[in-house]
Amino acid sequence: MEILNEPPPNPAGGETLIVDAKDSSAYERPSAALKHAGPDDQIFIRPGIYEDKIFIADRPILLIGAGRDAVQIFCRRGGPLYLQNVPSGRIMGITFRYVGSDQNSAMNILDSTCTISGCRATEGLLSGVVIYGPNCRPTLIDNEVCHNRESGIFVFAEARPYITQNRCFANHHFGLAARDPGTHPDFVRNTCHDNMLSGILMFHHAEALVLENVCRDNRHWGFVTTPECATTPPRGEL
């Protein structure tokens, strides 16, 4: 992935706050910049490894990293990224890594509607990315979700995200998973490979749009669904 040397233009028209632990004129950690950012401000994270915990609630977010191979945010005391009721915005170009011993995910998304692209979620003791809540409609595009102890991306509790062109691999359970009545993700053009169980799982009354996904080299099966689940197109046409 391309590494950004300079922040992109702020689409909201506000200021751009710089995070760089090696520059005394910049913010030392992303969470410090977030405390000072207005609703139209953008945060740009220069290359580096940052120990931090980012919690964003009830506000838009523009959080841009120099690239997922250049910027890592890790946390020992919980997941490094929590979004709650985030109405809009974008997060891109960052690796989120959980390094603790409790049951946490690398990305936790509750009832939010932002876009997450070009990121990496790794080493969660639960799934790498959990997406949940009846008002949860984020877009995840071109992310890597890997080396998590459960599934890569887990959608539940009536969430309806758009999940496209992500690569989910080397997770202990499934690449993509959906559960619960009212849950209805769009799984479009994702690649799930080398997961220890199957590529995609749907269970307990979940529904999903399932189009042009690739499931290969998983330990068990490519796509698994329990009988009460519904897919578009129907199972027999997948």
Where are these regions (language model features)?
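Short aromatic-glycine-(Arg/Gly/Cys) micro-motifs in beta-strand/loop hairpins
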Residues: E2-D20
